[in-house]
Amino acid sequence: MRALKMNSISVSVTHGLIFSTLLFVISVAGIIINRRNILILLMSIELMLLAVNTNFLIFANMHQQAMGGVFVFFIMAVAAAETAIGLAIVVAIFRKRKTIDLSKLNTLRG
């Protein structure tokens, strides 16, 4: 079992993958359980991207490749843009409809 060395902390690849899988499962559960609140859906998607980033970093460190870190930076940039756009849309919806409950926003009105 190979260990990742980070500033005198040794974490095995298995522990890192278990942590990443746990993050991914929590985010999927957040999406499945709470389909009504837009903010919780956005946070669950961000948590899912964090799990993917963790996987990229674990495997990049395991194979001593720098490309995993490069992919993480690109994913973080896309996630930041997605969060900014998503929150702007949520604010616009809240100002117009006075709610962010998805069950009340299912009508397409002009």
Swiss-Prot record:
Gene Ontology cellular-component terms listed: NADH dehydrogenase complex; plasma membrane
GO biological process: ATP synthesis coupled electron transport
Pfam families, per the entry: Oxidored_q2
Bilayer-spanning residue ranges: 13-33, 38-58, 70-90
Entry similarity comment: Belongs to the complex I subunit 4L family.
Subunit: NDH-1 is composed of 14 different subunits. Subunits NuoA, H, J, K, L, M, N constitute the membrane sector of the complex.
Database matches in HAMAP family: NDH1_NuoK (MF_01456)
Protein's UniProt name: NADH-quinone oxidoreductase subunit K
Higher taxonomy: Bacteria, Pseudomonadati, Pseudomonadota, Gammaproteobacteria, Thiotrichales
Gene: nuoK
